[in-house]
């Protein structure tokens, strides 16, 4: 089953995206055996990946994305994969999840910024207004 939905194939025409998404999924499933990145009951983790791709498709070009509480990298890491024109920052307070994000970003060659912090700690400051998209 293809990871990239057919309706997004024209939005993300890079032929290397599909194998990179598969590499991410393989890494996610491997790490998920050791740390809880996604529910172990999850039968189709690629659904989160596809949701992230739909999100990435509507973001304006050349912008900045700050994914607060990124966990396994949804949607931030996937957005960085699909949209190299964006500056992506991944904020995750759990060290073990940060280790996964570091490994994934390194293996996939993604120039993302990672912050191991809680927003409540005040380590993140907005320097300009932002559009907010929510999930969960």
Residue ranges of each PLM-predicted region?
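Class I SAM-dependent transferase core
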Residues: 1-66, 96-111
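Conserved SAM/SAH cofactor-binding pocket of Class I
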Residues: 53-136
């Amino acid at each position: 089953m293809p990871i990239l939905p057919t309706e997004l194939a024209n939005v993300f025409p890079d032929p290397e995206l599909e194998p990179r998404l598969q590499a991410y999924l393989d890494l996610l499933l491997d790490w998920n055996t050791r740390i809880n990145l996604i529910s172990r009951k999850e039968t189709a983790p690629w659904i989160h990946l596809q949701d992230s791709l739909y999100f990435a498709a509507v973001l304006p070009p050349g912008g900045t994305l700050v994914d607060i509480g990124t966990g396994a990298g949804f949607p931030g890491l996937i957005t960085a994969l699909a949209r190299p024109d964006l500056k992506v920052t991944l904020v995750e307070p759990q060290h073990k999840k940060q280790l996964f994000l570091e490994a994934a970003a390194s293996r996939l060659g993604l120039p993302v910024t990672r912050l191991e912090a809680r927003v409540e700690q005040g380590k993140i400051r907005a320097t300009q207004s932002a559009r907010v998209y929510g999930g969960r």
